[in-house]
């Protein structure tokens, strides 16, 4: 239909006369003869292959009643030409385009109602006048032709049968399509054509749409012959269309151009299977296209206009009398190639009179547009231009053709299915096989580079008619990148020279080309060589490999740069598996580590999931600040401590030669992180080595020495030498230093030991010069060790829930003033050195002198202490601390016989050449010394430094803390005290007294003066718990070794006496108890974080009654009568100790004061209830608990009975106490 429809198809004919009249049916049957289109002999369901049952198929839809059909036929015959033309228009209703041609497609549907028929007839009468007279004349002529062409005898059969057959053939558009077409259409007309269609056509379309048996016509063609309507202007077309029912494969409709293309009469295909006209070899291809096309149509909707597939088949030509005469049987059947375009459509559902709806799936229609394929050549040996179309042929490595373009059919004469599966070697000319071998060699070489193509020499290719064409080919190939094997070769061919025989579709001659056997064997060998060559592995050229390696190296380099940019952060992260549950200790250890006093919050990226790194602890920052301060790392002379005049109430330390951090003020220069403790306070664990005293001990391998003492106290010193302590007690003292410290204690006497410092002693070994390389080395070792410990701690999840408070406490441990700041929760040091050393009073004859730890300084000075004689008679201990000049600063504490007295004092060498020592003993009440040294806190801390205030020394809690987010570490700065009279067994109270780092010893007589408070100042390293968590009385602070605000009571002239009366649980921290006892003496002991190293006491006249403010539930406050003897199993109140007490104190039970410590001074009460007594409330921030979580576990944990219950009163307003403390 591309070339124009026949003029015969432009006539309009009455629907009733053409499609449904007896003459139409008879003429159709007569023309088809004995074909399957004869209505009576149809093989389809029902009669004539279209109807017979109210089926679900498009070709067999129910028809209207024969009576209605017959009446409609008669009426329409009487109406006239105009009515017939209008009805013809109704058949050609819906128009859609298909390959640019107009073709009618039936939409068989259910039978129409009588009302629909009447409505259609009325519209026919109304609009029939609109059509021209020539249309009516042509309609009448067409009717006459059909009546004459058919045999009337067929129409004279039984009228009922004929009418029945005609009624059943209602939806058959084939007779209509042969002779009935609207005048405006060049081919099959349809709605929407611009030429010759008036408004009445649309109305007729609507009429037909409303009626049954609707047909859908195709749009797109016919413009050439539009509006002609003249029979003489008929133009032959070279394509045709047909509609096939997908239910049974029967042809429902064909365009009239089938006569011009294949020679068949107009209705000969109707009722016959389409596949009968397809060549046998192409039927499989046709069937495969049908089966693949149907799912596409169903998936795209009911009317998939674009669901088109194209393929090529050979269709049979008609053997008619005109073409071949009467010798039909003797002539061979001829086939012609056609390109078929398949489109799947669905007929719409229509309502039946019985309300039966036809489903969509059963109304599937196949519209086929067949276009003949002509040869590309017009003259023999035609030289084609460069613009001639190309076609592609693809074959595998074995030479088997796998794909052929449909464009190759007109050039080669083969259909694609004819070539697929055959060897391409069979089509090469035998003389060109050598050329083809070279071509395939090049193909293999080019295959080394993906996408490479090349053009080969022209070669000859065999075509369908037995001739050869000369092809120019551009070759490309695909190589499997994994196996490096050739997958397929694609050739884009262009015909350079045509064949000798122009018609490429002619049959090839039966005679074969005569080739000698030698040539045949040679050709066979070449073909085998080509196939073998194609089967080889494609190797990569060296340059290609180099290029790829270079590209990969560049990509790797860029990737590594990006990676290094990401990893170049300062923090060191350790990737550990995510743990769903973190223990309280692990979580809070990281939390508290993040709020280190010197931590930078703005650049901290660590979280509870990120393991803490050593760099995040600002260790390197401290080192950098240390070197930026340009410290004196060479040995320098320490100032003699005797240059400072003693204060009347205590000792005063000489000022350091330069500003010192609070880390450095506790000791003159203890630098070894191997011992983790210093002589200044043997119960404080070193956490980070940031002192300016250099490295020694375990950290740098400078060696550590241990000195054993016989006192009950333990003295530790750090340095590079060895320290020895001698005594008669059972205590041990460990110390390292360049000098030797000796502590002598005697069992007799309970007096207080006065610490004195003097030059002399053994000559100091030259200390190791502190260098940055040593510190860096130490930094690396500590970082590795810390990460290892952190990995181990992360693995413990189950047991740690019980010990969470204990682990939290470890975060706050402090090893002494000789070391720097380190986040406590990192679990870096979990050895014995990190365990708190708790001392309990000993009330038996074991009144030993203290063991002194050695004093030699590392770098700028050593720390040596005579130790602390904590319990027993106040023996005298001497600690010799070596000075950088080789001199030794000796501190000695002499204990006076009596109750539990502490022995030797502690000698400490100050940093930067400042030499002083601290000596303090616990026995006996004495005046508490005050230290008014101007301490240069470095660096300044956010919590301000409270100026020294001379008042009664008390430990008071602070309820309003200014820095809410900071939890600094403890720094213990002890002060020596000179007891003047024998005392009872000292009671260790944990008060971190903040005084000067180094205090020269004073005379014992100076301690007898009026009580003066030791000025308490905020230190940058002091751990001040958050006041919002809970309020703690100073008595509780004594038990917890925590200073909420280490300031004296400014308004109290008398020292507060701590009663031994725990009233209520600690949870009632918002209430305070004032207990006044008329005791003659009040014992004040400066406490360490864990225990007291150099305890001191404040002697008070018995006439002075001191009121002690204690917290309910705190067993630290003990009345003065109870201080005479410590009850059985009652450890000294400390952070690590339990608040347990057996019966109230009895004065004759000194031997029951047992020390629950091991040989190293490590308390076995670490896992006791005192962990949770303070920190459970600190962490959980619950103020409603009745008692600490763990205090109920041990039956010994009972509240101490007070001797002065009646004198106690509850203070309901703790704010008054806060005013006494000051806001800090």
UniProtKB/Swiss-Prot annotation:
Residues 694-754 are annotated as: 30 X 2 AA approximate tandem repeats of G-[TN]. Residues 121-133, 794-805, 1209-1224 have a biased composition (Basic and acidic residues). It is found in: Nucleus; Cytoplasm, Perinuclear region; Cytoplasm, Cytosol. Expressed in neural tissues and in several nonneural tissues of the abdomen. Malpighian tubules contain a circadian pacemaker that functions independently of the brain. Expression oscillates in all tissues studied except for the ovary. PER-A isoforms are mainly expressed in adult's head. Residues 694-752, 895-907 have a biased composition (Gly residues). Induction: Expression is sensitive to temperature but not to light. Essential for biological clock functions. Determines the period length of circadian and ultradian rhythms; an increase in PER dosage leads to shortened circadian rhythms and a decrease leads to lengthened circadian rhythms. Essential for the circadian rhythmicity of locomotor activity, eclosion behavior, and for the rhythmic component of the male courtship song that originates in the thoracic nervous system. The biological cycle depends on the rhythmic formation and nuclear localization of the TIM-PER complex. Light induces the degradation of TIM, which promotes elimination of PER. Pfam families: PAS (PF00989), PAS_11 (PF14598). One of its GO terms (biological process) is regulation of locomotor rhythm. Residues 238-373, 391-497 form the PAS domain. It comes from Drosophila melanogaster (Fruit fly). The gene is per. Phosphorylated with a circadian rhythmicity, probably by the double-time protein (dbt). Phosphorylation could be implicated in the stability of per monomer and in the formation of heterodimer per-tim. Keywords: Biological rhythms, Cytoplasm, Nucleus, Phosphoprotein, Repeat. Its main location: nucleus. A motif (Nuclear localization signal) lies at residues 66-79. Sequence repeats lie at residues 694-695, 697-698, 699-700, 701-702, 703-704, 705-706, 707-708, 709-710, 711-712, 713-714, 715-716, 717-718, 719-720, 721-722, 723-724, 725-726, 727-728, 729-730, 731-732, 733-734, 735-736, 737-738, 739-740, 741-742, 743-744, 745-746, 747-748, 749-750, 751-752, 753-754. Residues 16-47, 908-927, 1158-1177 have a biased composition (Low complexity). This is Period circadian protein. Mutations in the PAS domain result in longer circadian rhythms and courtship song (PERL mutation) or makes the flies arrhythmic (PER01 mutation). Residues 66-79 have a biased composition (Basic residues).
